[in-house]
Curated annotation (Swiss-Prot):
Belongs to the peptidase S8 family. The keyword Signal applies. Its main location: membrane. This is Mycosin-2. The active site is at 103 (charge relay system), 133 (charge relay system), 435 (charge relay system). It comes from Mycobacterium tuberculosis (strain ATCC 25618 / H37Rv). InterPro entries: Peptidase_S8/S53_dom, Peptidase_S8/S53_dom_sf, Peptidase_S8_Asp-AS, Peptidase_S8_subtilisin-rel, T7SS_pept_S8A_mycosin.
Amino acid sequence: MASPLNRPGLRAAAASAALTLVALSANVPAAQAIPPPSVDPAMVPADARPGPDQPMRRSNSCSTPITVRNPDVAQLAPGFNLVNISKAWQYSTGNGVPVAVIDTGVSPNPRLPVVPGGDYIMGEDGLSDCDAHGTVVSSIIAAAPLGILPMPRAMPATAAFPPPAGPPPVTAAPAPPVEVPPPMPPPPPVTITQTVAPPPPPPEDAGAMAPSNGPPDPQTEDEPAVPPPPPGAPDGVVGVAPHATIISIRQSSRAFEPVNPSSAGPNSDEKVKAGTLDSVARAVVHAANMGAKVINISVTACLPAAAPGDQRVLGAALWYAATVKDAVIVAAAGNDGEAGCGNNPMYDPLDPSDPRDWHQVTVVSSPSWFSDYVLSVGAVDAYGAALDKSMSGPWVGVAAPGTHIMGLSPQGGGPVNAYPPSRPGEKNMPFWGTSFSAAYVSGVAALVRAKFPELTAYQVINRIVQSAHNPPAGVDNKLGYGLVDPVAALTFNIPSGDRMAPGAQSRVITPAAPPPPPDHRARNIAIGFVGAVATGVLAMAIGARLRRAR
């Protein structure tokens, strides 16, 4: 990524948290000197009709999110105010920008126009969210305000991009379910059957993914549930880009599993759920081919750096979407405490030649580590301070609000901000995590794309990065180049910069040149010489015979 602007006053007020390496098992993985990953364009997956690669079944009840006291859903979300979205609307509202949300599906809502993009879980249309995650992510990106703020006028007045391929946006709320299912456990973090351990080869089902909302924190105080606002009452759920169009692609879910699931251990939570790195790759290609100009991926797979598995198909898909189809790809950095995820070192003062500390990476976050094509997003709190549990790594590009989150319910359509307890003695779990930080940045990307449609995907990322509020060191592995500033991204005089990431081309694997045709010149000369000699000898013999005959 390009270096950030050196502007006084744009340093974040937050200082980076002290590094504590967290492992999910007793074995702490050794650091690995890994470079940014290369990609092989020959591995781009075909864009077939979305569907599962094996029979799937429903294994859990759908999640029913609730409303807790804090944050107050009757007020604007603190993150909305922190990054000053309402002022950014003076310059852009993301009018007509197609934003693909590769997640757990999006339930239609009158405040959230959404286009069906397909379903890699059950082969449906993607307009169903059993995990109450994709709908919340989409709410942060593009929900229309209700009551507290008026709907802004579309900016720019004319959409800069054609509508996405497929049916027109769905704006009607779905029919209410006949029976409300009991609450399911809150969507656990990413489901990688490989634990953080020294380098055994990845298991066959490594790379399974799930929503990257934060895991429960037993040290937090319990937030009591409160009644939601009555239907139609003003609420604080407001999207960053309310005139963008969501393309919903259901790729992952904790409520579904293969008909013949494998298990990584006796704990049922370790069973492989729906969603893998390969299905993310296919979803990325499909989203790009539908015309998405921003692709939000709020799911994360964490693998040990010593054995990151075969990610060639995913890398090729990201390359294709970003460079061939010109889509801005935004991904959650991941949360320390999710399955397989842990903080990487921040900086090695003994190796200033590697300022992002790639050589000490212990855990890879995918797709974030494909930083030539992906803008990875870390999380800050409501005051702009770095979240200690936001996963650090050299791929983190920027940060955005990741706490005090609210969104629209996939069931009733009203405001929600937490998951209920799943077992006796557990607490309500307010929404938090880098999933929602990525959604903020996807909304900002939609604002920038609408205002500057001539910029390439990488130039849009460059503008977001260069206008961010830098951390004290200018850049670090927790916040990247700092907290996003939508107003600055839309108004600062920032050179467009390179059309592609400068280092990207050097990491593209090109097919080997075909071998040169065989050189038969020596053989041909020899054959010609032998033929000439033979012809001469034959001519002399015939001439001698003719003379004797006379």
